[in-house]
Every structure is written in C-alpha cells, then in structure tokens.
C-alpha cells in the first residue's frame, strides 16, 4: 500500500507501518487507526479498500506529513534564525540548541574536529 508517497510494508501491523511516514509517530498512528475504525494489530495486507481510503482521508485532512512536514520544520528554524533569537543563533552556528555542554562532546552537531594551530596543553611544573 502506498501512502503519502511512501510504500508501507505489507507484512507489518498497521500501527507500525504508519510510522514509516515522516510526521506520523506511534501515538498519531494509533489515533488515525482509532478514527478510521481499524484494529491496530491488523496487517497492511489485510486492509480492505474502504479502510485504506479512510486512513488516507484522515491523514490528508488532519496531518502534515512527508515533504510538507519537512518544509514546515525548515521554515520554523529559518524563522528563529531570522528573528535573531538565541535558538536561531545556535542553529546558525551549528551548535547544540537545547542547552547541552559544548566544551567536550557535541560532536554530532559540530561535525568533525578542526585542529587549532598553536594550541598546546600546559605541561606539569
């Protein structure tokens, strides 16, 4: 079954398969299936056309998914950077945004180490 441009695995339970779509997590998947009246443990291959259509309708009307959700996230980060707030500054400098330490660690956000020339560790006296 194809949903929002993503091929859902047919052998998985519906609640798990829906999380393959960007913007739908575990809780959202459970809510979608409850509204559509589909059992969460039903496999995607076992869904009827009416159930699949109901799921598509709910996601199309009530959720922002895939490219739309990614674009929305990028716009909110760009807005933070444009207004010049602290969080925007941290995004602009590619540093951790949520208050983590940066003296050590933070390598995921900062990227590969850049060696600083002329900096030596002080020896013992």
From Swiss-Prot:
Region described as Disordered: 93-125
A Pfam family per the record: Ribosomal_S13
UniProt-listed Gene3D superfamilies: 1.10.8.50, 30s ribosomal protein s13, domain 2 (4.10.910.10)
InterPro entries cross-referenced by the UniProt entry: Rbsml_uS13_C, Ribosomal_uS13, Ribosomal_uS13-like_H2TH, Ribosomal_uS13_bac-type, Ribosomal_uS13_CS
GO CC list: cytosol; small ribosomal subunit
One annotated GO molecular function: structural constituent of ribosome
Annotated GO biological process: translation
Listed NCBIfam families: uS13_bact
Role according to the record: Located at the top of the head of the 30S subunit, it contacts several helices of the 16S rRNA. In the 70S ribosome it contacts the 23S rRNA (bridge B1a) and protein L5 of the 50S subunit (bridge B1b), connecting the 2 subunits; these bridges are implicated in subunit movement. Contacts the tRNAs in the A and P-sites.
Protein name: Small ribosomal subunit protein uS13
Organism: Chlorobaculum tepidum (strain ATCC 49652 / DSM 12025 / NBRC 103806 / TLS) (Chlorobium tepidum)
